[in-house]
């Protein structure tokens, strides 16, 4: 029995029926990581000893008849900007090389308390700044569908690990599409929850008003399961909302009769690969056949989301990353003469090119004389975009679009063209600007590579997204596609 072929909810059932032990399941996945990861490069740290100890402890609980939680012994990986006690937390940056987290992020704590076995930390773009996982200071993660292509980013390690069956589940973070776009490129399911649905305590900040921890799995049910575990109010994060978390499993119904879906015409313009467009239109026919009503709408301000996003995110990054100064932790330059030198040289030596670029852009946007022209204006645009989404959700249950304008591209293809790379997030960024939830799920192939469909929902309506996504998934076979490694 190859446990790596099972999804998390299936492994949970096998373990609860005593048809497998947590240790057996953990060992099988660790073996897969050893065999596959030298090709894929999804992991930055493999926590073999910790995982086996946790698995044995869960088996011990089961032997006493104790409940081990919603995850029930399923393995998972954690993006390397989410703190896990006694594991590295480098954010794929040289500036945090060797840093070991002394505490758990709230989401890591939740995963452990609900019977999840953490197999290690996953690669990413440095400080989550990027769309391809080529900006990692340590290694380039490869797409399991084609090892010469990117897995997406910044949670590329998370998506690649799930797609290659190294883990059935993973946590990532999503600031402008960093869970959904890699999910699309790797042919899996990825959810970015509503801003405030999931705690950010213990997550290294990039853009504090945009960041959200998201979930990745090989099907909608697995994503719903992991989202259930990490959602809810947290006294350590005052931005979490004290709003009831529904039982997401109850929303996994194929019945979507009467659901109203909006189709924004601005998301189907120049730059969209015709094969991706066809996959989305084919998917719309499935939603119609299942009883949903689809209407074309206009979201004209969505065109300004990318511009507003890069001003806001970079401004927040400029502030958030000021703490990495070579004084308290992380890299410290050895060739220094005074305190200013420590700060300047440590950051110059250890931050990567993309991180430096975004810090400079953000500092410029916040500087005297430019604040009103750039940052303040971007905040106004953000409010207008939020208003547009809120108006649509008065009449509709969801909005559908492509997740990305193209399938996965070749490694190195867009590294020298920043604008082209940034425009790859054109469909995902508006979601973070507005703070709404969105899910990406596989809906077809283009040139043998997965295509993702994005469903956006109203605030705290993740259950509606799971309902629509599950209905589509059960009517198609795309989620059963797997890469051959």
From Swiss-Prot:
MF term (GO), any: glutaminyl-tRNA synthase (glutamine-hydrolyzing) activity
Keywords: ATP-binding, Ligase, Nucleotide-binding, Protein biosynthesis
Keyword Ubl conjugation: no
InterPro entries, A to Z: Amidase, Amidase_CS, Amidase_dom, AS_sf, GatA
Enzyme Commission number(s) of this protein: 6.3.5.7
Cross-referenced SUPFAM superfamilies: Amidase signature (AS) enzymes
Reaction catalysed by this enzyme: L-glutamyl-tRNA(Gln) + L-glutamine + ATP + H2O = L-glutaminyl-tRNA(Gln) + L-glutamate + ADP + phosphate + H(+)
Keyword tRNA processing attached: no
One GO-annotated biological process of the protein: translation
Active-site residues, record numbering mapped to chain: 79 (charge relay system), 154 (charge relay system), 178 (acyl-ester intermediate)
GO cellular component terms, semicolon-separated: glutamyl-tRNA(Gln) amidotransferase complex
Self-association state and partner proteins as the record states: Heterotrimer of A, B and C subunits.
NCBIfam families registered for this protein in UniProt: gatA
Family to which the UniProt record says this protein belongs: Belongs to the amidase family. GatA subfamily.
Known function: Allows the formation of correctly charged Gln-tRNA(Gln) through the transamidation of misacylated Glu-tRNA(Gln) in organisms which lack glutaminyl-tRNA synthetase. The reaction takes place in the presence of glutamine and ATP through an activated gamma-phospho-Glu-tRNA(Gln).
Name of the molecule in the record: Glutamyl-tRNA(Gln) amidotransferase subunit A
Annotated source species: Clostridium botulinum (strain Eklund 17B / Type B)
Lineage: Bacteria, Bacillati, Bacillota, Clostridia, Eubacteriales
Gene that this sequence comes from: gatA
């Amino acid at each position: 029995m190859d446990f790596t072929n099972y999804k998390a909810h299936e492994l949970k059932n096998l373990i609860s029926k005593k048809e497998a032990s947590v240790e057996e399941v953990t060992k099988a996945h660790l073996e897969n990581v050893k065999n596959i990861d030298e090709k894929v490069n999804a992991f930055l740290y493999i926590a073999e000893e910790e995982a086996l100890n946790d698995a044995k402890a869960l088996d011990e609980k089961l032997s006493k008849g104790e409940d081990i939680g919603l995850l029930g012994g399923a393995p998972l990986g954690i993006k390397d900007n989410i703190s896990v006690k006694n594991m590295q937390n480098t954010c794929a940056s040289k500036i945090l090389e060797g840093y070991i987290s002394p505490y758990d992020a709230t989401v890591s704590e939740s995963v452990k308390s609900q019977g999840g076995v953490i197999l290690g930390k996953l690669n990413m773009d440095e400080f989550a700044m990027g769309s391809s996982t080529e900006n990692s200071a340590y290694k380039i993660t490869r797409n399991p569908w084609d090892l010469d292509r990117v897995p997406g980013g910044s949670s590329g390690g998370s998506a690649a690990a799930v797609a290659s069956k190294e883990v059935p589940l993973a946590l990532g973070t999503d600031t402008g599409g960093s869970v959904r776009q890699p999910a699309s490129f790797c042919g899996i399911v990825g959810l970015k929850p509503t801003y405030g649905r999931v705690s950010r305590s213990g997550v290294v900040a990039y853009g504090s008003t945009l960041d959200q921890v998201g979930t990745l799995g090989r099907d909608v049910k697995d994503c719903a399961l992991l989202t259930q575990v990490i959602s809810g109010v947290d006294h350590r994060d005052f931005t979490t909302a004290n709003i009831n978390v529904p039982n997401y499993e109850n929303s996994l119904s194929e019945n979507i009769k009467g659901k109203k879906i909006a189709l924004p015409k601005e998301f189907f313009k120049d730059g969209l690969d015709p094969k991706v467009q066809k996959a989305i239109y084919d998917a719309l026919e499935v939603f119609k056949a299942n009883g949903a009503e689809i209407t074309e709408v206009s979201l004209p301000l969505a065109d300004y989301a990318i511009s507003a996003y890069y001003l806001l995110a970079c401004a927040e990054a400029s502030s958030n990353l000021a703490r990495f100064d070579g004084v308290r932790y992380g890299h410290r330059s050895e060739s220094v003469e005074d305190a200013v030198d420590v700060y300047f040289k440590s950051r110059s030596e250890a931050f990567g090119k993309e991180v430096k670029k975004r810090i400079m852009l953000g500092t410029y946007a916040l500087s005297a004389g430019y604040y009103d022209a750039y940052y303040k204006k971007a905040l106004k645009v953000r409010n207008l975009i939020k208003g547009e989404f809120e108006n649509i959700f008065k009449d509709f249950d969801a909005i559908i679009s492509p997740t990305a304008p193209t399938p996965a591209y070749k490694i190195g293809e867009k590294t020298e063209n920043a604008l082209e790379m940034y425009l790859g997030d054109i469909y995902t960024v508006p979601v973070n600007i507005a703070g709404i939830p969105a899910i990406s799920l596989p809906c077809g192939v283009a040139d043998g590579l997965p295509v993702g469909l994005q469903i956006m929902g109203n605030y705290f309506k993740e259950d509606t997204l799971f309902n629509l996504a599950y209905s589509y998934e059960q009517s198609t076979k795309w989620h059963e596609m797997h890469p051959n490694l």
